[in-house]
Amino acid sequence: MHKVTSEELFQRALKVAPGGVHSPVRSFKGLDRAPVFFKKAEGAYLTSVEDKKYIDFCQSFGPLILGHLDAEVKEEVHRMVDTAWTFGATEIYSLELAEWITSTLPFMEKLRFVSSGTEAVMSALRVARAATGRTKILKFEGCYHGHVDNLLVKAGSGLAGTAASSSAGIPAEVAAHTVVAPLDDEAKLAEVFAAQGKDIAAVIIEPLPANYGLLVQRPEFLKKVAELCEKNGSLLIFDEVISGFRVGLGGMVEKTGIRPDLVTYGKIIGGGFPVGCYGGKAELMNMVAPSGDVYQAGTLSANPIGMRAGLTTLKKMQRVDGWNVLEQRTKKFTDAIKAGFVKKGVNLEISQVASLFWIHGPTASPIRSIDHIPANQGGNFKNLFLKALDKGVYLAPNAYEVGFVSLAHSDELLEQAAQIIVDAAE
């Protein structure tokens, strides 16, 4: 009996979906092979349609901090499936998660659940514009905030005076409302504010940029961002879709000591289900309908299965001291890879923050902006990725995506994976 292969499935998928996928990074574009098609996931492993097991460091790009099919989350989800799938009405499950978040994180005075990080960002920007009466949004080059039209832009020539869309189908007049500034450059940021500060409704930033490599920001730079926002009457929005509940219970708000006006969440907050959230200061969130005139709605917002999965995940992480456990495990893992690269004499390095890591080319100084990323990043990664994949390690299939470690990754498994990654390096 013929067993279907990933290549065969990809050819079928190409006939029914753009590029054969439902999110671009899954396509293995630039890797000169078809993507692996998976049929099962459990713990730290993915199993392909060819019945090959892979140690998974993608973890669905971040949501699965406990690993795939965590027993406690699975039990709660099964219970919820037998109770209700969706209400489209008020229910107790979103209330319980909202109360847990607002009582745990003092900067989240009020919040609204949505179905994705993109929706959370889109809604937060709308609140900011309504609150300030201004139209422009300042974002940073190298920070990703979902596929919101006016944030899918990159800097034009010169000092962020204009912005050009990074996607077809976005009118120039939409992109014109976005100002793009470089990361890690207080002087240029001050210049942008001096020129356009009175028009900037909000600054949105990943306080730990992790969608274009792992671009760890200096505390001084983040403080300058907050200072200029306050001075110019612009709101500060932290996009913690990746870093929220990943780097610690309080995310980068807690790590930096900076209190933004609004924060956006996704990924971990839904425990593996499609959930996003935006919230912050009560006076701002009270502007959202039906309390105020900022309209935002969603048929499946606060779906009960996602609410229970998210709450179960967060409570377990808190109970087992999950963030400290993960940070220690990940550091041991990345230290082993780092030592292996040095011993082998390969021109690769690895950066790590909490349970996030990123493999990149050598640099003379920390990579804090996209300008610091080595020019040969793509080529270095391609060979490493394909060799590691062949040996059973699944990294995110893009040179600029970070890796994620979950509680399902034991020390022994991480030691095994580290050796595979080192062996794959050249």
From Swiss-Prot:
It catalyses: (S)-4-amino-5-oxopentanoate = 5-aminolevulinate. The keyword Repressor does not apply. Keywords: Cytoplasm, Isomerase, Porphyrin biosynthesis, Pyridoxal phosphate. Its main location: cytoplasm. Its cofactor is pyridoxal 5'-phosphate. The modification N6-(pyridoxal phosphate)lysine is found at K267. Its EC number is 5.4.3.8. It is found in: Cytoplasm. GO terms for cellular component: cytoplasm. It is an enzyme of class 5 (isomerase). One of its GO terms (molecular function) is glutamate-1-semialdehyde 2,1-aminomutase activity. One of its GO terms (biological process) is protoporphyrinogen IX biosynthetic process. Pathway: Porphyrin-containing compound metabolism; protoporphyrin-IX biosynthesis; 5-aminolevulinate from L-glutamyl-tRNA(Glu): step 2/2. SUPFAM superfamilies: PLP-dependent transferases (SSF53383). NCBIfam families: PRK00062.1. Belongs to the class-III pyridoxal-phosphate-dependent aminotransferase family. HemL subfamily. Homodimer. This is Glutamate-1-semialdehyde 2,1-aminomutase. It comes from Bdellovibrio bacteriovorus (strain ATCC 15356 / DSM 50701 / NCIMB 9529 / HD100).
